Swiss-Prot record:
GO terms for biological process: cytochrome complex assembly. Keywords: Cell membrane, Cytochrome c-type biogenesis, Heme, Iron, Membrane, Metal-binding, Signal-anchor, Transmembrane, Transmembrane helix. Disulfide bonds: none annotated. InterPro entries: CcmE (IPR004329), CcmE-like_sf (IPR036127), NA-bd_OB-fold (IPR012340). The lineage of its organism: Bacteria, Pseudomonadati, Pseudomonadota, Gammaproteobacteria, Lysobacterales. This is Cytochrome c-type biogenesis protein CcmE. It is found in: Cell membrane. Residues 30-153 are extracellular. It holds the Pfam family CcmE. GO terms for molecular function: heme binding; metal ion binding.
Length: 153
């Protein structure tokens, strides 16, 4: 191998090493920012790392919403048809938030309660987020409840 070929090989190997390192760093950064969607059943079953940030999806239980007068602190429960999980948030809730509607909340589990730093609500009476619809459909099939296909946008 000539000196020119050796130098070229060294540069190619260095470029491959640098691109591999860059790919690994990007993958690690993205992994830390991913928030997976779980249902209350999965959370209560222990499928979630208690220290991790994740999204909780389901329906707001009717009669569970509570907000003290003059406070932003809101408490409600989310269900997937199998289990219910208490949720608290001190953020402003979206206008479309209501009991009996689908929500996706982002946050962390703390002492058995999901502390949400963001709550997203459905857009209209036919819309349910696809991930929530899929997981709710699984719960309905498990309990032999007829599954109505919501419109997914």
């Amino acid at each position: 191998m000539t000196p020119v070929q050796r130098r070229r090989l060294a540069w190619v190997l260095l470029a491959l090493l640098a691109s591999g390192l860059a790919t690994a760093l990007v993958a690690m950064a993205l992994e830390r920012n991913i928030a997976y969607l779980y249902t209350p059943s999965e959370v209560l079953r222990g499928d979630v790392d208690a220290q991790s940030r994740f999204r909780l999806g389901g329906m707001v239980v009717k009669g569970s919403f509570n907000r003290p007068v003059g406070s932003l602190e809101a408490r409600f429960e989310v269900t997937d048809g199998d289990a219910q999980l208490a949720v608290t948030t001190s953020r402003i809730l979206p206008d479309m938030f209501a009991e009996g509607t689908a929500v996706v909340a982002s946050g962390r589990l703390q002492d058995g309660t999901f502390v949400a730093d963001e709550v997203l609500a459905k857009h209209d009476e036919k819309y349910v987020p696809k991930e929530v619809a899929d997981k709710m459909g699984d719960a309905h099939r498990k309990h032999d409840v007829p599954v109505t296909a919501p419109e997914v946008r």
